[in-house]
């Protein structure tokens, strides 16, 4: 009887212990000089898919750090279609106009279910008109992490595009040919996925540091020609505006911040992804320099404008879950106080601490806002999905002052309405609406209203803005929907705050 067998006899609770075999019995690759370093490398995406164990009915995930420049989602799903996969759940952190190619793979049954922060373009239009049998689950950035944490969403294989990685899987978005900057979305997928496949443009020597995605999270690595076009990150929702009306609204929003009571040394802010929201940053610079007020940090999607303020010493730290342009991506590589964070650290209501809980001021956009301050950023005036939840309801709930910026009208369609088509962020989370026709303050914040009026800002009742809008356009004709639910709007805690119904033909 050997020593291990004696242990089994004398200590029954140790029966699972095994006797020593060889030094490499548990790590056979260490006995192979090639496999020791290259065992994760795959010659093709197809090889990585086969090694991952992906099967019909499983869940695949992607990140959208390249936004409209992404080349991974369409490439991988097209391959899975050729390989014969069916009934998959697609869990991308968001979907863009560039993902219209998914329509054929939904129609053919390759993709049966979708979890996403949002969608745009022909894909969103097709789904809004009933393309899918199951409704799309639309979550916030923080809410996505909570769905993973709670076990409703389980990622079987994550396909994560990165500009560079070493042969063990240490990867970042700040080096290589196609720098996208922060990999805040991908960090969550790498943590929760059963298997992680990296698609990398460059294979660089070990150790590739700093590592946003770490070697102990990565299973397989495929070198590909391109994962994305970083030049297309700052288009669409993340574009920079020169529109005079949007700039005027941005200036008004900066005035609101200045006189809100929160504009003081050490304040914190997030400026969102909409054109007027991002433009607000440049007007804040002028006010900060004039008053000598410096911000402790800025959070969220980071823009070149925020980088400028950081490098001028006006913002101490940048906490970055997504870079909205090349300037931000370059800053992340060189500025030690420009720090990458995951969406879990950013805004997960189920995390042990979310950075958004430290926010003083946030500027957000809206497709619609109603007289009860409920906000819609998902469906357009035609009822078609054309936006994304993003971090909207996350930061709106957490910040001390939540400001929504929007024009009163868009193409003769009212933005201020009696009731939003789709409710994403509840009115209780919205404090101020800034439009080109005036500023409305939620009645729950009378102290803010008083401060703004004392400063001489044009404060009006939100009902007056609604009346002004319909006096210019008339009351919009109600949208015709069928009874079929095509989208489920999940609040950040996972609850259902609204649904989207199919648009009638």
Segment roles from a protein language model:
Residues 1-505:
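Conserved alpha/beta enzyme-core scaffold
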């Amino acid at each position: 009887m050997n020593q291990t067998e004696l242990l089994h006899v004398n200590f029954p609770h140790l029966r699972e212990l095994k006797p020593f075999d060889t030094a490499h019995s548990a790590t056979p690759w260490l006995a192979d000089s090639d496999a020791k370093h290259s065992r994760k490398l795959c010659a093709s995406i197809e090889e990585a898919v086969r090694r991952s164990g992906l099967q019909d009915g499983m869940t695949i995930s992607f990140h959208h750090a390249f936004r409209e420049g992404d080349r991974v989602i369409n490439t991988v799903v097209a391959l899975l279609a050729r390989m014969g996969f069916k009934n998959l759940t697609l869990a991308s952190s968001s979907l863009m106009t560039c993902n219209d190619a998914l329509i054929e793979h939904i129609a053919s049954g390759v993709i049966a279910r979708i979890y996403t922060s949002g969608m745009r373009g022909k894909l969103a239009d097709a789904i809004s008109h009933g393309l899918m049998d199951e409704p799309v689950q639309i979550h916030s950035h923080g809410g996505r992490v909570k769905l993973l944490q709670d076990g409703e969403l389980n990622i079987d294989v994550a396909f994560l595009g990165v500009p560079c990685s070493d042969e063990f899987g240490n990867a970042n978005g700040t080096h290589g040919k196609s720098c996208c900057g922060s990999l805040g979305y991908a960090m969550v997928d790498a943590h929760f996925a059963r298997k992680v496949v990296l698609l990398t443009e460059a294979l660089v020597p070990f150790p590739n540091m700093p590592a946003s995605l770490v070697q102990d999270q990565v299973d397989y690595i495929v070198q590909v020609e391109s994962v994305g076009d970083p030049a297309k990150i700052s288009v669409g929702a993340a574009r920079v505006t020169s529109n005079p009306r949007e700039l005027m609204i941005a200036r008004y929003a900066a005035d609101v911040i200045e006189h809100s009571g929160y504009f003081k040394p050490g304040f914190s802010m997030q400026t969102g992804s909409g054109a007027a929201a991002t433009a607000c940053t440049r007007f804040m610079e002028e006010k900060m320099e004039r008053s000598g007020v410096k911000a402790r940090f800025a959070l969220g999607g980071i823009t070149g404008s925020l980088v400028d303020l950081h490098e001028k010493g006006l913002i101490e730290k940048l906490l970055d879950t997504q870079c909205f342009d090349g300037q931000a991506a370059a800053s992340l590589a060189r500025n030690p106080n420009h720090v990458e964070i995951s969406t879990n650290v950013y805004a997960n209501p189920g995390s042990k601490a979310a950075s958004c809980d430290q926010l003083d001021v946030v500027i957000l956009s809206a497709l619609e806002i109603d007289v009860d301050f409920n906000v819609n950023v998902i469906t357009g005036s035609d009822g078609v999905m054309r936006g994304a939840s993003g971090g909207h309801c996350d930061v709106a709930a957490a910040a001390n002052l939540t400001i929504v910026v929007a024009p009163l009208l868009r193409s003769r369609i009212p933005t201020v309405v009696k009731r939003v088509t789709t409710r994403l962020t509840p009115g209780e989370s919205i404090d101020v609406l800034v439009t080109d026709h005036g500023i409305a303050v939620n009645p729950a914040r009378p102290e803010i209203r008083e401060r703004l009026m004392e400063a001489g800002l044009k404060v009006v009742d939100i009902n007056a803005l609604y009346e002004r809008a319909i006096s210019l356009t008339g009351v919009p004709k109600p949208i015709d929907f069928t009874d079929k639910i095509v989208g489920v709007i999940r609040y950040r805690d996972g609850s259902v705050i609204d649904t989207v119904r199919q648009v009638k033909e």
